[in-house]
Structure formats: C-alpha cells, structure tokens
Amino acid sequence: MLRIAIQAKGRLNEDTMALLADAGIDVAQSKRKLIARAKGFPIEVLYLRDDDIPQAVHMGVADVGIVGLNEVAERGMAVDEVMRLGFGACRISLAIPREVDYPGLQWFEDRTVATSYPHVLRQFFADKGIHADIHEIAGSVEIAPAVGMADAIFDIVSSGGTLVQNGLREVEEVFYSEAALIARQGLDDDKLADIEKLKFRFNSIVNSRGYKYVLMNIPTALVDQAVQIVPAMRSPTILPLAAEGWCSMHVVIAEDVLWEKVERLKELGAEGILVLNLENMIP
C-alpha cells in the first residue's frame, strides 16, 4: 500500500482532493485525523503542511506526495518528480517599489531582499553573479519594503493583485511552479508499480483538460468535409442514423478552437450539436 502526503488545508488540498475523487479514489476527510485510508485504490493519505511534504517523501514517511514544485525546490530534498498535475500554477518573482527605476538585475547588487524562499533566490543570484542580502521572513513578505525591512521582495505571484495593493511591481520572473506528484527515491518494485497505476489515472484526467466531446448529426454526403474540419485524435466516430442519408459524428475538440470548429460544422450542415465535458481521456 502506498502512503501519499498532501496539503492539510487550503486551495492545494481542495484541488488535490478533487483530483483523487476524479481518479476514483474516495478519501474521508476529517479535521482531527492526520492519516486516512482511501477506497478505490490501495493508498493511505497523510495530511501535512505543504512545506513538510518534500521532507516527508525524502525520509520515507510517505512514498509519494502532491506539492508545489516551489516547495520541492526550496527544501532541496532528493525526490523524483513523477508528473506535473496542471493546477496550483504560480511563479516566484522579484518585485520592487513601483516608483523605482529598474535598469536590470544589477539593481539588486548589495540590496536587501525579503523572501520565504531564500534557497531558490540564493541559487538564482549566485548563477547571475549578484551579491545581495537575503532576509528570510515567514509571511507577509509583500509589506517588507513599505516598513523598511527590505528594498525588494522575492515571492509567489499569481495574478499580481497583491503586489499592486502594496505599491510593488514585478521585474523578474525567476521560477515557475505548479503542483506535481513526487516520489521517494529507491522504492521497491511493488510500490513503483502502484505509482504507475496512480500516474495512469492522473494522466487520464490531466489529458482531458482543455478538451470537449462533441456529438452532432450530419448528412452522410458531408462527412468527408466535416472530417477535414475536425480530424479528432485519430479519426471521428461515424455512426449511421435511422434516418436515411444521415450520420451521427462524435469527436474530441480542443477548447481553444471549439467555437470556431462548431461554427464551421454548423455552416456545413451539422444539426443537433451537443458539447459535453470530458472527465478522463486515455490515449
């Protein structure tokens, strides 16, 4: 049985629980329990703080974990990245007071930078040949320049709204992060096999994101033209209807071109077009 470490609460916990549910893994949540047994897969769930997950996986307290890559990079623990999960996306960036002119990275030479990610920042500055005073603080990093604690900050940025509210602007994106499935190194073959099964389920969900399943009725004589518009993953499914001269066409279409394709199919002569969500897509 695998043991997986996930964030105990917060947005990452919500997204992780949704992923597990979509993968057919039912986990009973309780605020009082740190460990829960799951149904639908041989796995036990360990609830931790996100910054403790890389260490828990590295030490073997958990076999696998779901955590942001920013935490993996900051903790510097030797773990394997199994796959990226497509949620929890953010970037860690350098930001300075809005009114300050910014000539480039050399601006940070001999400056004080406040951050909760000193390891990542120290490595970045070392690679760029910048010497700066890195001041580690646990929270509310964005207020550091305003209270005279630092000249700049290095912190997580999602929309940038928090920076604007605190009179800051982003000047250098240093690290891109998203949630990932990580694993302990040196696991036995049985656990590696279970991880592959878990990865298979997660991949089917991640692969389905950004796609829609589209069904339509179309005159048989127009099928070849319709296939040119939507070639699908390999080829659309074409089924004859009871009405003579008509077919039902089933196809997977990427969301970013969905409406353009549907409009062209409608103009061609398709009728009764249904657009459905995809839960899983297995190549």
Question: Which role does the model predict for each range below?
Answer:
Residues 1-42, 67-80, 84-91, 99-283:
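Small-molecule-sensing regulatory modules
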Residues 42-61:
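Short, structured active-site "lid" loops
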